[in-house]
UniProtKB/Swiss-Prot annotation:
Residues reported to bind substrate: N80, H86, D93, V107, T108, R117
EC number: 4.2.1.10
Pfam annotation, one family: DHquinase_II
UniProt name for this protein: 3-dehydroquinate dehydratase 1
Catalytic reaction(s) noted: 3-dehydroquinate = 3-dehydroshikimate + H2O
UniProt subunit comment: Homododecamer.
Residues at the site labelled Transition state stabilizer: R23
Alphabetical UniProt keywords: Amino-acid biosynthesis, Aromatic amino acid biosynthesis, Lyase
Pathway assigned to this chain's UniProt record: Metabolic intermediate biosynthesis; chorismate biosynthesis; chorismate from D-erythrose 4-phosphate and phosphoenolpyruvate: step 3/7
Source superkingdom: Bacteria
Residues annotated as catalytic: Y28, H106
Amino acid sequence: MAEPATDTILVLNGPNLNMLGTREPEKYGHATLADVEALCRETAASFGLKADCRQSNREGELIDFIHEAHARKMKGIIINAGGYSHTSIALHDALLAVQIPTVEVHVTNIHARESFRHHSYTARAAFASLCGFGIEGYRLAIQGLAAKLGLKPKA
């Protein structure tokens, strides 16, 4: 049985997000995935939470992480499914199956990009979606999730 993590949120990053900092910096900026994870841990801690940060380029592994979040009774999920946002009904279904409050994040404004990026399956399984704020969107997502959970910043 998985060890409970009731004070933890899952921060899930999908394909190619391991390339942040070097991948198309004119679109994604120069911050790395390590920078994103540090930002998430810091923001989560300000609400008395831990951030379990995961990244995978494989759809099935992302689904396994979502199922693990359910088994461990995590409080919430922040997800940037990358390109899978626009194609993966399986990720959508996994998020709905676990019924964990979820916020979708995209570093860029997906609605100002190619038309195939305008639709997001993962957004339909989330209570909120943020895009276009750069990596700051992760901080905003955690703050929004904390508000949804009724958590206040710790002094």
